[in-house]
């Protein structure tokens, strides 16, 4: 053996030759050798024991993971192969990775990973962490029963209490079912009544499926589509699915459609149920699942031809309910007081959930709670206050899942306080909530067809809503619900269930969509709760005056185009008609501004400064043109956040408006509607915009009476200009965007108009033969007479 290739046998290897005179040394060396050998044996034994323990650990971990995977309906992991295994060459093509990888810095062996069927990559460790939590949801016990019903029935009703996991898990099981079928793979749609729920649930499910949001899992809400050609599971608002049905009446893209939160009975959900009931008859391969959080599901079963019912209980704990002895005069004040008291006095850990009615109220409450807790000094526990309402951007909505602040050294408890609209009633589940404060109010749409007024009013909630709110406190452990109303009010004054939205809404948009879907016989359309005939008649009348329907009630070319815009019919008409007045660019901007939340910020501590800032944008002719000024200034200042802050403008609203404007522009381009502007230096620049406003809102006009108040034209309702208007004078004729019912009747977002435009632009509506007697009629009669004479022909 050459020196270079000789094995290094070590100095312990006995040599064949014995050196003379070294007996004593040899004995000593032998003893050393023995000691070292024993040490090595001990080391080897310890190493063997360590390896055995590692193997045992790995075996246990694999066994528990396999049990978890098998219960989830996934294949178990295989044992890892050695590098020389005959299978290793094919490991990349197998459904499991064949090698266990060694992490050098710890020496631990990680488990072989399952391949994600959607990405063809190994699942991330986070996937398994989330999977463990998923498998603890009550809904998992019912997976086999669910799959069995899904296979055997075309439609069925599923009742699952909030927190059972139905919204996140059922759609994923439907994806599994669709992937198991032969032929082209259709998608799964899951509708939500609220934008916030559609966005946050889609994000959660994308995490659970270990995919990127917007790829295999996406969402679609008005003015925002986060999906792609790869999307197989789409969460969307019910209105968006209805819009998809207009261009795809049989909804061929989907194999399963889930109507979630159906108990909320929104306008779009009710219409969708009627549409899907018909689609199911024409498509035997379509599955429809109606999901509800309340137990009054019998009505849904009967509606869908006595289909089966699957009930999944939630995991709820007892909730202690407290009422106020006397009615509260100011529920907002009482709510803030209750939050502070619970935070200071309750010795149990646990987060708070406060229900309020809208964004302004929520922002105000958040500010005041923070201020009051800060004033209490450092001895009190830290508090994290999180608002929740539909117009919050997705990343801020995700804050509700953050942990509460830690305990202080003095033992003071840190708490999370979520201040939410009724979206937290059933749509979203927030773990960790132990205390619920329920003032007993929510904003509801109310419609009076006689005077054609639809308003959002703060009204008392139903008993069903109150029960849902209380249930939020018992999700993780026994909780407490503080109702800021009396027990007598709960028992005697509250309705059992919330009135379906279809019975209290203006149906203009709905009728236009149904006509676009080819449903002409509205009287015999299968509504779950048919609306009042008068409400339907008012909707048909509105669409006829807007020229969306002809006198026979058929959809016109204009009406068909209007239906493609995700806007109220009046706004859609105004956008299309603005092309004829050379101001479609400006009307697009105004429409976008009207489609987003209020852009003017008016903080309690800086009302005067905010009002002064607003007046810098004010246009003499009114609020619509003021909104246009704000949008133009925002763009000229390069969409600056600081500029918005300095001018008391809501940056988020302006960015949303910009997004809405781009989407509406794309729809205009699709129909070859020209986007143009009148020369800014022309005296007609603002006149043309105001005329375009009249094309959509000629039915929403008020006339100033000699007594100093306004009367709405035709309906003769006494109204006043809303205090927020920039009009510093009282024009004789005003067009208004909305009628606000509060302590007084207000008209909001108003513009000064000329009566001549009314009779020229909407002669059918301003036909004097069926006009009620009033000062406005006498004025219009005179104008019509003048217009008919040649002297006024320039109009």
UniProtKB/Swiss-Prot annotation:
The chain positions of domain Helicase C-terminal read: 338-518
User: Any idea which UniProt keywords this protein has?
Assistant: Acetylation, ATP-binding, Helicase, Hydrolase, Immunity, Innate immunity, Isopeptide bond, mRNA processing, mRNA splicing, Nucleotide-binding, Nucleus, Phosphoprotein, RNA-binding, Ubl conjugation
Q: Looking at the Swiss-Prot or TrEMBL record, what is one Pfam family this protein matches?
A: OB_NTP_bind
Domain Helicase ATP-binding: start-end pairs: 147-313
User: Does the record carry Ubl conjugation as a key word?
Assistant: yes
Task: Write out the ranges of the annotated region (Disordered).
Answer: 1-111
Q: What is its EC number?
A: 3.6.4.13
List, as start-end ranges, the regions of compositional bias called Basic and acidic residues. Answer: 20-62
MF-aspect GO terms? ATP binding; ATP hydrolysis activity; double-stranded RNA binding; RNA helicase activity
Supply the SUPFAM superfamilies for this chain: P-loop containing nucleoside triphosphate hydrolases (SSF52540)
> Could you tell me which InterPro entries the record lists for this protein?
DEAD-box_helicase_OB_fold (IPR011709), DEAD/DEAH_box_helicase_dom (IPR011545), DHX15_DEXHc (IPR044756), DNA/RNA_helicase_DEAH_CS (IPR002464), HA2_WH (IPR048333), Helicase-assoc_dom (IPR007502), Helicase_ATP-bd (IPR014001), Helicase_C-like (IPR001650)
Q: Where is the composition biased (Low complexity)?
A: 79-110
Q: Where in the cell does this protein reside?
A: Nucleus; Nucleus, Nucleolus
Instruction: Name the chemical reaction catalysed here.
Output: ATP + H2O = ADP + phosphate + H(+)
Q: What is its main location?
A: nucleus
This chain's protein is named ATP-dependent RNA helicase DHX15
Tree of life domain: Eukaryota
- Motif DEAH box, which positions? 260-263
Modified residues annotated as N6-acetyllysine in this record: 488
Q: Which residues bind ATP?
A: 160-167
Show the cross-link location (Glycyl lysine isopeptide (Lys-Gly) (interchain with G-Cter in SUMO2)). 786
């Amino acid at each position: 053996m050459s020196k270079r290739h000789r094995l290094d046998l070590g100095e312990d290897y006995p040599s064949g030759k014995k050196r003379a005179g070294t007996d004593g040394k040899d004995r000593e060396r032998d003893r050393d050798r023995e000691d070292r050998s024993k040490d090595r044996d001990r080391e080897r034994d310890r190493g063997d024991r360590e390896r055995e323990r590692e193997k045992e650990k790995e075996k246990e971990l694999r066994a528990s993971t396999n049990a978890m995977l098998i219960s989830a309906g996934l294949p178990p992991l295989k044992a890892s192969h050695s590098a020389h295994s005959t299978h290793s060459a094919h490991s990349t093509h197998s459904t499991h990775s064949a090698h266990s990888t060694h992490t050098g810095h710890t020496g631990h062996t990680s488990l072989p990973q399952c391949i994600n069927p959607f990405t063809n990559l190994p699942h991330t460790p986070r996937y398994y962490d989330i999977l463990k939590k998923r498998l603890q949801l009550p809904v998992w016990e019912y997976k086999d029963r669910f799959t069995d019903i899904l296979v055997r029935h075309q439609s069925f009703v599923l009742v699952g209490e909030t927190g059972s996991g139905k919204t996140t898990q059922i759609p994923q099981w439907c994806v599994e079912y669709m992937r198991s079928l032969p032929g082209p793979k259709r998608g799964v749609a899951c509708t939500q009544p609220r934008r916030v729920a559609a966005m946050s649930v889609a994000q959660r499910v994308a995490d659970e499926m270990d995919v990127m949001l917007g790829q295999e899992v996406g969402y679609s809400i008005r003015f925002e589509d986060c999906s792609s050609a790869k999307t197989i599971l789409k969460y969307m608002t019910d209105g968006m699915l209805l819009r998809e049905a207009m261009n795809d009446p049989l909804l061929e893209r989907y194999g399963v459609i889930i109507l979630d939160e159906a108990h909320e009975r929104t306008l779009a959900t009710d219409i969708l149920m009627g549409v899907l009931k018909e689609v199911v008859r024409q498509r035997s391969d379509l599955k429809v699942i109606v999901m509800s959080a309340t137990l009054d599901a019998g009505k849904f079963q009967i509606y869908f031809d006595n289909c089966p019912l699957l009930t999944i209980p939630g995991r709820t704990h007892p909730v202690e309910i407290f009422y106020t002895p006397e009615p509260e005069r100011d529920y907002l004040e009482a709510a803030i007081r209750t939050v502070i008291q619970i935070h200071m006095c309750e010795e149990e850990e646990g987060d708070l959930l406060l229900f309020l009615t809208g964004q302004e109220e929520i922002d105000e409450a958040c500010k005041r709670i923070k201020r009051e807790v800060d004033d209490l000094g450092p001895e009190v526990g830290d508090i994290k206050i999180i608002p929740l309402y539909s117009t919050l951007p997705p990343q801020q909505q995700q804050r509700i899942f953050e942990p509460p602040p830690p305990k202080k050294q003095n033992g003071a408890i840190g708490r999370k306080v979520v201040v939410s609209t009724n979206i937290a009633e059933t749509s979203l589940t927030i773990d960790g909530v132990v205390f619920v404060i329920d003032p007993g109010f929510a904003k509801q749409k109310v419609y009076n067809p006689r005077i054609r007024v639809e308003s959002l009013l703060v009204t008392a909630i139903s008993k069903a809503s109150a029960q849902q709110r209380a249930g939020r406190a018992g999700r993780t452990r026994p909780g407490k619900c503080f109702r800021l109303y009396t027990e007598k009010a709960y028992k005697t004054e509250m309705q059992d269930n919330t009135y379906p939205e279809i019975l209290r809404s203006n149906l203009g948009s709905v009728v236009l969509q149904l006509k676009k879907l080819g449903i002409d016989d509205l009287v015999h359309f299968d509504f779950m709760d048919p609306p009042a005939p008068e409400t339907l008649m008012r909707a048909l009348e509105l669409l006829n005056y807007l020229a969306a329907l002809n006198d026979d009630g058929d959809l016109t070319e204009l009406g068909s185009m209007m239906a493609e815009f995700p806007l109220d019919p009046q706004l859609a008409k105004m956008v299309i008609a603005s092309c004829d007045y050379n101001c479609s660019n400006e009307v697009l901007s105004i429409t976008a501004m009207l489609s987003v939340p209020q852009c003017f910020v008016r903080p309690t501590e800086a009302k005067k400064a905010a009002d002064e800032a607003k007046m810098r944008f004010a246009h003499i002719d009114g609020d619509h043109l003021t909104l246009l000024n704000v949008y133009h200034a925002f763009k000229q200042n390069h969409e600056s956040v600081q500029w918005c802050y300095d001018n008391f403008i809501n940056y988020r609203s302006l960015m949303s408006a910009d997004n809405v404007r781009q989407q509406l522009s794309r729809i205009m381009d699709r129909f070859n509607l020209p986007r143009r502007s009148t020369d800014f230096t022309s005296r007609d620049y603002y006149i043309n915009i105001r005329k375009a406003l009249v094309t959509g809102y000629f039915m929403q006009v008020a006339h100033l009476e000699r007594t100093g108040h306004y009367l709405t034209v035709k309906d003769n309702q006494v109204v006043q200009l809303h205090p927020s208007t920039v009009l510093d004078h009282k024009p004789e004729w005003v067009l208004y965007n909305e009628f606000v019912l509060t302590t007084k009747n207000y008209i909001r977002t108003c513009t000064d108009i000329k009566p001549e435009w009314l009779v020229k632009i909407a002669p059918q509506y301003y036909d004097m033969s069926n006009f009620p007697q009033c000062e406005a009629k006498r004025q219009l009669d005179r104008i019509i007479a003048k217009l008919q004479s040649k002297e006024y022909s320039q109009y």
